[in-house]
């Protein structure tokens, strides 16, 4: 009898372990698809529209061509020649290059330009954009697959919707913003882990990466994190306040680690004309609800990047609107 019970127990344990292994494999496959499908979509778009290396066009427009590319050219020379990142004599009598680096060029993805010739920088940056979009799908897949035990292709579809959103299409030429968008799902995942499991390491590292790569978008992520924390479902008031202390400490720790670039960036901004009078701007609505709703329909125009009206690229699709309704 004892042997039979032991055999049954062993069989159940093996069955449970096999289920766990299958779930892990399935999750890995979904995450991989969340990376490769946006990558294939972007590669297809590059082929159709003749973006380098499949033609002479570029994913960069406006400031991307006239401002960012010269910055990448200087960075390329500095990395290849072993020059300092603190200063550059390429502009006038010289400029504080570190403050410029902290906003435009601090992404680790930019090291990939070293694998290209200087004449291929435009192609290199376009490929970096495609890679960041694909990685955004992957990080979204990691987050969404962690939210449910039942893994399905819907996880991949939602991740693709995030990676190929209207925001990405409209602003992908602002290549320095994409790192923060890419790491955003991990920031949220880390924040939830901090609240539920008292483990703030992932949140701290993810927020540090966002602050290090681009403080502009990271500032918006910080605002979102505060709002997300306030409206999160806590078990008790005690948990809300005690986790709040941890939330604040890990947030300050992330900012402290990123201070190596945040402080030079702040000092650099203070020396500019816009930094002399740092006051809150006037607020006004740039669009109306009817126009925003109209953008959600098929055959509409959800993307606005050929003018400077300041309208936000907010597109979630009519199916989402109907689901919310």
Please provide the spans of the model-predicted regions:
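Start-transfer (signal-anchor) and selected internal transmembrane alpha helices
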Residues: 1-51, 246
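Membrane-interface junctions at the ends of membrane-embedded or membrane-associated helices
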Residues: 4-5, 16-19, 23-25, 147-150, ...
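Alpha-helical transmembrane segments and their immediate interhelical/interface regions
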Residues: 22-35, 53-59, 212-249, 293-319
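Membrane-interface helix-boundary signature
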Residues: 27, 31, 118-128, 187, ...
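Transmembrane signal-anchor helices characteristic of membrane glycosylation enzymes that use polyprenol
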Residues: 29-64, 70, 250-265
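Membrane-embedded helix bundles of polyisoprenyl
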Residues: 38-42, 130-143, 152-234, 247-266, ...
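Active-site lumenal/periplasmic loops and adjacent helix-entry segments of GT-C-fold
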Residues: 48-148, 153-185, 209-213, 301-307
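Periplasmic/ER-lumenal interhelical loops and adjacent helix-loop junctions
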Residues: 62, 66-77, 94, 102, ...
